[in-house]
């Protein structure tokens, strides 16, 4: 199709590109990321990337399918990614935050969509980020079926961007995990995290700022950055393998609020969790953060996962089998506590 130009060619014309939005750059990005997305596709995905909407057929193996959705971002962990030009794994964090959330209700993640917003689109950087998103989707077994790249001049500082993700999964109606069956004497298993995951970075950055340039930080800077920016662990495949073998009473993704807030979210009012901190090995990174930030024990447990990224609650007779299944799936697992009866007005969690 041709469009005639009736304006005076001698005048200085304003275009979308001169206004700060490069449509051609956006199109180049789409072509670059298509192969990454293609590797994530499942048989239920109908069509490819580029349509107005993404189509996905609910798997036929479910009798009473219930869709479970979740959305999240990466928070100020992005600031460290910008500072150290580490863009290749931040997309894994984005996927992990949503798929781990829907996983705790027993849902199998089906598909994922992303939102990438920036002031000026750097195609190379955006491609690294979205390749990481695709890698996260592969780890979670879900399809990257669409997304949005928004170039918005004046909205973000140069070199910075923001991310949001959206995941949808499915679970049988009679297999939804909601914690309602948790009883006294059930056991609490903790699965190791890969680091802080994507929470607590405003506090982390404050600690780093306080000690910037000081020679006595106690850790090599490269090691420290690697530890902080380690991508959030995706627990989907190991947890789904566990759910296929035995009944799980409760799951909790340890995100913002730490152990203190996230475990009580799944407990009935009649019980409380007793957690023993000596039962697992807290990674040295958290010791460094606590020491150099002069952070209280309670604040650490309220902000960080402290080395535990996912909680699994099972009946005592299933604990050993559950541990073995999770370990065979590559997880590091500890029995970190148990469930006790709770009297009205008493705490829903005690960590000693």
Curated annotation (Swiss-Prot):
| GO annotation (BP), single | 'de novo' IMP biosynthetic process
Q: What metabolic or biological pathway is this protein involved in?
A: Purine metabolism; IMP biosynthesis via de novo pathway; 5-amino-1-(5-phospho-D-ribosyl)imidazole from N(2)-formyl-N(1)-(5-phospho-D-ribosyl)glycinamide: step 2/2
Would the keyword Ribonucleoprotein be found if you checked this record's keyword annotation? no
- Database matches in CDD domains: PurM (cd02196)
Gene Ontology cellular-component annotations: cytosol
Q: Which NCBIfam families match?
A: purM
Name the UniProt record assigns to this protein? Phosphoribosylformylglycinamidine cyclo-ligase
Q: Which organism is it from?
A: Nitrosomonas eutropha (strain DSM 101675 / C91 / Nm57)
């Amino acid at each position: 199709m041709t469009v005639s130009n009736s304006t005076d060619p001698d005048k200085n014309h304003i275009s979308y590109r001169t206004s700060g939005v490069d449509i051609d750059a956006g199109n180049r990005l789409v072509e670059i990321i298509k192969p990454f997305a293609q590797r994530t596709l499942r048989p239920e995905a109908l069509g490819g990337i580029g349509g107005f909407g993404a189509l996905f057929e609910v798997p036929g193996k479910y009798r009473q399918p219930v869709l479970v959705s979740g959305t999240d971002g990466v928070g100020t962990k992005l600031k460290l990614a910008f500072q150290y030009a580490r863009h290749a794994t931040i997309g894994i964090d984005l996927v992990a935050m949503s798929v781990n959330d829907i996983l705790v209700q027993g849902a199998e993640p089906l598909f994922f969509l992303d939102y990438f917003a920036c002031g000026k689109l750097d195609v190379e950087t955006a491609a690294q980020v979205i390749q990481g998103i695709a890698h996260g989707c592969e780890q979670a077994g879900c399809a990257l079926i669409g997304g949005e790249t928004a170039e918005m001049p004046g909205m973000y500082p140069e070199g910075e961007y923001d991310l949001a993700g959206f995941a949808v999964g499915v679970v049988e109606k009679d297999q939804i995990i909601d914690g309602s069956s948790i009883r006294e004497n059930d056991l609490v298993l903790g699965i190791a995290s890969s680091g802080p995951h994507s929470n607590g970075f405003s506090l982390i950055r404050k600690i780093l700022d306080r000690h910037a340039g000081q020679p006595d930080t106690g850790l090599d800077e490269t090691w420290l950055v690697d530890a902080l920016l380690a991508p959030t662990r995706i627990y989907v495949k190991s947890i789904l393998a566990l759910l296929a073998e035995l009944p799980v009473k409760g799951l909790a993704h340890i995100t913002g609020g730490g152990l203190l807030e996230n475990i009580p979210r799944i407990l009935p009012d009649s019980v409380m969790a007793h957690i023993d901190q000596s039962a697992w090995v807290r990674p040295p990174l958290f010791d460094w953060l606590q020491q150099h930030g002069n952070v209280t024990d309670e604040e650490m447990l309220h902000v960080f996962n402290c080395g535990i990224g996912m909680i699994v609650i099972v009946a005592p007779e299933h604990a050993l089998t559950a541990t073995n299944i999770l370990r065979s799936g590559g997880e590091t697992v500890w029995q970190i506590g148990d469930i006790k009866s709770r009297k009205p007005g008493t705490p829903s969690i005690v960590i000693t």
